Curated annotation (Swiss-Prot):
Protein known as: Phosphoglycerate kinase
Catalyzed reaction equations: (2R)-3-phosphoglycerate + ATP = (2R)-3-phospho-glyceroyl phosphate + ADP
Gene: pgk
Keyword set includes Endoplasmic reticulum: no
Residues reported to bind substrate: 21-23, 36, 59-62, 113, 146
Source organism of the structure: Shewanella woodyi (strain ATCC 51908 / MS32)
Gene Ontology annotations of biological process type: gluconeogenesis; glycolytic process
Residues annotated for ATP binding in this entry: 197, 319, 345-348
Record PROSITE patterns: PGLYCERATE_KINASE (PS00111)
One Pfam family it belongs to: PGK
Length: 391
């Protein structure tokens, strides 16, 4: 990839505009989860160290374009950054017609989604943003799959467009996992529906040595194998699709293993009583919420021998502890594996946090939709823009 990296540039005295993903949960004016902010700090600090006048922009939530709404203000993010950075940080509400930015300070632009034309990648808006800087830095992998004014258009018109350390790190890790992986390459895809992950499953089934499915997705594969799934969440209209994917895997010398034992309950609730059953013994009034110990041990063995592991989605309803043992065992197996491992997606990161394996996963992706689209083999608009500007 012919992408310019921010780390390679002389930024002394330059006006540097960094697009970060600072879309964090806020409650009563306080940031309640700072993972994305912590991920963005190294890039902001590097620009400061290089002597730049630093401007930062991001979206937060889904406000109505053209309307200021304090609920979606980046003020809580500015408050956080003020404590995290040893320099002045201020919020600029009106910046499109010019903003004063000095070397050694950070100016955070108010929510880019307050600007009319942001989501539609309006060219006039993109040009206004580009006119504010000498160097545009795209560092928000979490929004790299969206062609919007602040993630794509601005980069086409800025004097220089480059990737920040976070984005560059994401692309390097994903490239290592998908483009030239140490084999065997094992992918775990969980989640509730086959339909939302169908293109991911399709794409991965052609390149991985072993595809593992979990969650509601696995229920559809269990049904496709001819087993009763009771009242479990599954997609009857995609059973043929599941059979085809399984056949594809077998034609490549692999398979998509169906659980041999499952954990069921009669209701979906935090207090539901969990019962362990063989996969062929699920009754009509039961729901499958996790894989059983035999199945999780079999998967752990697969992971033990992997060269590369890509994890997207839990294998059970791990939010309830009685249905979390499968995901917990998978997490432990990934932590113990010598394979290069990459985890991505909101539920996956929640599981990584819950089971305390963050420092044992080789790379944790900050992208949700962007992570999935990369796995699907789709071109990410922001990355394509950076490649075009790097030539």
């Amino acid at each position: 990839m012919a992408i310019i990296n921010m780390s390679e540039l002389d930024l002394q005295g330059k006006r540097v505009l960094i697009r970060e993903d600072l879309n964090v949960p806020v409650s009563e004016g306080v940031v309640t989860s700072d993972a994305r902010l912590r991920a963005a700090l190294p890039s902001i600090k590097l620009a400061l160290e290089k002597g730049a006048a630093v401007m930062v922009m991001s979206h937060l939530g889904r406000p109505t374009e053209g309307e200021f709404n304090s609920e979606f203000s980046l003020q809580p993010v500015v408050d956080y950054l003020t404590k995290a950075l040893s320099c002045p940080v201020r919020l600029a509400k009106d910046y499109l017609d010019g903003v004063e930015a000095n070397v050694g300070e950070v100016v955070v632009f108010e929510n880019v989604r307050f600007n009319v034309g942001e989501k539609k990648n309006d060219e006039a808006l993109a040009k206004k943003l580009a006119a504010l800087c000498d160097v545009y830095v795209m560092d928000a992998f979490g929004t790299a799959h969206r062609a919007q004014a602040s993630t794509h258009g601005v980069g086409l018109h800025a004097p220089i467009a480059c990737a920040g350390p976070l984005l560059a790190g994401e692309l390097e890790a994903l490239g290592k996992a998908m483009d030239n992986p140490a084999r065997p390459l094992v992918a775990i895809v969980g989640g509730s529906k086959v339909s939302t992950k169908l293109t991911v499953l399709e794409s991965l089934s052609k390149i991985v040595d072993q595809l593992v499915v979990g969650g509601g997705i696995a229920n559809t594969f269990i049904a496709a194998a001819g087993h009763e799934v009771g009242k479990s969440l599954y997609e009857a209209d995609l059973i043929d699709e599941a059979k085809r994917l399984a056949a594809n895997a077998q034609s490549r010398g692999g398979d998509i293993p169906v659980p041999t034992d499952v954990v069921v309950a009669g209701e979906f609730s935090p207090t539901a009583a969990a019962t362990l059953k063989g996969v062929s013994q699920v009754s009509a009034d039961e729901m499958i919420f996790d894989i059983g110990p035999d199945s999780s041990e079999a998967l752990a063995e697969i992971l033990k021998n992997a060269g590369t592991i890509v994890w997207n989605g839990p294998v059970g309803v791990f939010e309830f502890d009685q249905f979390g043992e499968g995901t917990k065992r998978i997490a432990a197996a990934i932590a113990d594996s010598s394979a290069f491992s990459i985890a991505g997606g909101g539920d996956t990161l929640a599981a990584v946090d819950k089971y305390g394996i963050a420092d044992k996963v080789s790379y944790i992706s900050t992208g949700g939709g962007a992570f999935l689209e990369f796995l699907e083999g789709k071109e990410l608009p922001a990355v394509a823009m950076l490649e075009s500007r790097g030539k």
